[in-house]
Amino acid sequence: MKGKNKYFTDYDFEEAYQKQIDNLQQAEIERLTKNRKGIAYQTKTTKAGNQLEADIYPAFGNRQDAPRTKRGNKSRPAQKNLNDKRAKRYLNNLISANFGKGDIWATFTYDEEHLPESPEDADRIFANYIRRINRRRRKAGKDNAKYIVVTEWSDDEEKGIRCHHHVIIDGSNDRDELENLWRQGSRNHTRRIDPDPDTHAAGIANYITKDPHGRKRWRASKNLKKPIVTKSYSRFGKRTAERMATDRGYLEERITKAYPGYKFIDAEVKINDINGGFYIYARMRRD
């Protein structure tokens, strides 16, 4: 949208910039950037726990110069169905903002006698499970559980209904207690989270959101902290951003300088083959 700086940024930059610059020869990059459009670069910073993401992408003087994308009925990041990269990234940040070392990652299954009739029935069963947990917690003087649940559902002609829940929940409950309160199946697994310092919860998020054979949907408790998102036109100027896109050492140097107290992890650079603009995505973690 156009704000007080009169830049147009109301477009899907993740969809508009998809060609990996690392896969291109220098001559191809120069050809694509010859007629480059865009008068500034906007930086979107997302802080989630000790993780930080920076999206750096072109802003335009008018709508006509911005790349066209298929807007249609785009799914929102907070959707129940995990059907696109945006939803998975949102979920990863939500996990990073709320969970860490000592919290619990669990998988709960159903035996044949307790299979839900539908995904909605599975949601109801899991909601009842959380109510049982929270009753125990209130008696112990604890707050309600913080959790994220991803439900995987399939209904195959040969195998029939298959359903299970991947859950990340705060570590206030004992693992045995959590398993005992689940009454729909016995093939369950719980473990304490011990995240990698660089990727934090990304490994868990990637696993529980991997492309399923059936459907995946997710829900979260209402007491979670939201990732902190800010936007700026002044963090990286146009010339700086364009040099960062083609000089990996300079990219790491400028990103590290822009976010003191954070360690650079990795970055990827993409280019739009119509307007020659760059999109930089960088990840960092707090030292």
Describe every region a protein language model picked out:
Residues 1-161, 171-287:
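Right-hand nucleic-acid polymerase module
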